């Protein structure tokens, strides 16, 4: 006899809390994506929004900034909000009232804070302001670029995800190279002393944040992540494979794994 699926109201309280948080995070990340798309329509190089939140919880936009320039070590101010009607042409296709309204929506809860996209302002004199990092325009390409900085001939990544009321935890299993070779990634919980990780610990955090967003947003999960099986894995639970964007053969030197 087929098992009856539990209704939402019949789920244990912890499962209900997890489902509620995941639904909120999915919605707010989707709004965050939409904000980024509209900002980049006017300012393609945009990477950060500088905002403040007053005592009533209302958001004020102070600037739109580029990513950090490695050559000079700072960001470029792309747009400085103003109250001068004669300078409205500088706004381009960006509707600032609509943008601020959506920022108010996503910042009234704590969901985006869990993903590390909202941080204190990097300049101490503006410490009462917030620094919002916009999501990558292409998360899969961003993940591939980060990993290929450390493993140049990487072609795919296998990982697992654990969802609970605290968020999404990401476990890295292995990388597949262009030669077909598989490189296992040590688990920090199972092998805390291992130094064989292909990238530094802070890179794992950077990757986990973007991978978690791919997983929690259904349309991105369906587009980029494929369920897979590895009988040799030391961990239980579903594994997922992310195949990296195509690259011209011979464009990189083989890495020294093996």
Where are these regions (language model features)?
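Detector for the mature cores of small, proteolytically processed
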Residues: 3-10, 14, 18, 56-139, ...
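Phosphate-interacting basic helix/loop segments used at nucleotide- and nucleic-acid interfaces
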Residues: 28-42, 138-148
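Core catalytic machinery and nucleic-acid-binding channels of phosphodiester-processing enzymes
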Residues: 17, 24, 28-34, 38, ...
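Conserved functional acidic sites
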Residues: 49
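Long, positively charged binding patches that form subdomain-scale interaction surfaces
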Residues: 149-151, 171
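Acidic, metal/cofactor-coordinating or nucleic-acid-engaging core segments within structured domains
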Residues: 157
